[in-house]
A protein has these predicted regions:
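Acidic (Asp/Glu)-rich catalytic clusters
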Residues: 5-13, 32-42, 67-70, 91-99, ...
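Conserved anion-binding
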Residues: 53-140
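A C-terminal functional module that forms or caps the active site or interfaces directly
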Residues: 135, 139-178
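Hydrophobic faces of well-ordered beta-strands that scaffold small-molecule active sites
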Residues: 1, 17-19, 46-50, 76-78, ...
Length: 178
């Protein structure tokens, strides 16, 4: 019931729901299908924050898997550490399900000690801006100056999403920064 209450509460104020499907304790295909239907009826995108990072062939297979992410997600996150084929694999996964979706590449992270340095960020932006399957980038919501620099690098053609935003600035649990 909690997820359905969430849809009802936030639908008028947000465009997408960020999920971590593998953290849903009582997950079942039937219940998740009802959740996705309710989100769709509320005109909400479902954004699975899976952070795919493997080669294209494996990423494509992961889009099916036990959770069949390709059948219900509108957006997914991915690291570009394995190269641009990860995006091709994710797009192929959606195509296998006769759907379309978009990839948000992690250009920055708000977690303490992460290894996404400025050189990596530049390469992610360069590669992502050239790929039609990439709809945007994840920026560091805890550092406005970094998000501003990311916007300058990305331009206006792609979105920047900033998880890690919280009304209380500071450190959260296990390295999360707000």
């Amino acid at each position: 019931a909690g997820l359905f209450d969430l849809i009802e509460t936030v639908a008028p104020y947000v465009a997408a729901l960020k999920t971590h499907v593998d953290l849903v304790d009582d997950w079942s295909p039937e219940a998740w299908g009802r959740f996705c239907k309710a989100a769709n009826e509320a005109d909400l995108l479902i954004f699975e924050d899976r952070k795919f990072a493997d080669i294209g062939k494996i990423s494509r297979a992961q889009m099916s898997g036990i959770y069949d992410v390709r059948s219900w997600s509108d957006l997914v996150t991915a690291h570009l550490i394995s190269g641009p084929d990860v995006v091709d694999g994710l797009q192929a996964g959606w195509k296998d399900a006769n759907r379309e979706g978009g990839v948000l590449l992690l250009a920055q992270m708000s977690s303490r000690g992460n290894l996404l340095n400025p050189d990596y960020t530049r390469e992610v932006v360069r590669t992502g801006c050239a790929h039609d399957g990439v709809v945007g980038f994840i920026g560091n919501g805890s550092r406005p100056e970094e998000v501003s620099a990311l916007r300058d690098a990305v331009g206006e053609e792609k979105m920047i999403w900033t998880p890690g935003v919280n009304l209380a600035v500071g450190d959260g649990e296990m390295g999360q920064r707000y």
